[in-house]
Structures are given as C-alpha cells and as structure tokens.
Amino acid sequence: MTKLRRGFSLVEMLIALTITSTLLAATMTALHASFRAYKFTTDAASTHVVSRIVMHRLLTMVRTGDQFGPYPADVLAANQNPLTSTYLEFISYYDANTLTKKVVRVERRDAKSGEQGPYTLYIIEKTYVNETLTATTDQPLLQGVTDVKFTLEYDIGPRLRRATVDLTVQPADTKDTSLHTELSAPTIRLVSSVMPRRLELEQ
C-alpha cells in the first residue's frame, strides 16, 4: 500500500503567503524610494545647471550694457549708494545712425498660475526708434526663484561701477518627492559681481 505524503496545511499556506507578500511589499517600497531619490537628485542638478546659465547670462548683459538703472538720487549719499533693488535696467544696444536702441529690464515677479514660485525672473526688451517704442518682448527667464537682489554701486555720473547679483533658487519639482521621502530640497544660492566693460576700458 502506497503511503500518502502530507501536504501543506491551510495555516502553513497562509503563513507562506504572508511572508511572500511582505517581501514583495518591502521590495516595491525600496524601488519606489530609489526612484524618488533619483528624481530628487536629477531635478536639483538640472535646476543648478539652469541657474548657473542664467547667472552667466545676466553677468554678460551687465558687462556689455550701458546707462544702468535704477540709480540713486544722490550718488554721494552713503545710505543710497550702493543701491539694492529687485530689478535691473540698462541699454543693451544703440545705433546712432538709425537712432535705434534696445532697453532691457530684468525683474522679479510673483509667480503666475502654473509657474513654480514664489517668484519668477523675467526679462523684458523694448526697442525704440527715435525715442518711439516699436516693439516689446516679455518672457520668463527662471522659475522657482525665492529671492533675487541686484546691488548696484555707482560712481559720479551716475556711472555703474559694480553690480552684484544675489540669486536664490528652489530646485524644481521637489514637492512630490518630499511627500514620499525624507529628503529636503536645499536651495541654490549664487552670488557674483561684475563691472561694465566700458568702465574697465576707461580704467
């Protein structure tokens, strides 16, 4: 007579299923956390690169610009010069033959719906022909700006002697990540100073 082998009991099957499901859940949690950490790192790195590009562009525009603003009412007053502002304005192009000039303004604005806040850095370019406005372009330069300050040091004239840009940016798309991990998104702060090229040539 053949002896029957004893199979798993219902309790043993339930225990095995519980162990298996626990291992699968732990694996999925680890994969999910790894994906969120990867997303967090790439978003922060991307924002850092973009912020540096914007900073380099701002410094280049200041270096080649002319007739900067805002400027203090009294250049010799220590409480007015240097001047700190949330916007910067200057002439980026001028043609004496056609009387054409382009005025660029970089300013901080409250973020609109759909933009990462609290602020967005905008660049506005206005074209004048014989002092008549002929064209205007307005576009965002950088989102996720938490603060931006332009510190302008003037000489008698007033001529801009030195401009310091202090830019603080929050890495993009980190809110969703922070809900699932304990990662906190560090802000990116870039500070740099530049002198207009015309001033350097004069010196």
Please report, for each region that a protein language model flagged, where it lies by residue.
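Generic macromolecular interface patches on structured domains
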Residues: A37, F68-G69, K175
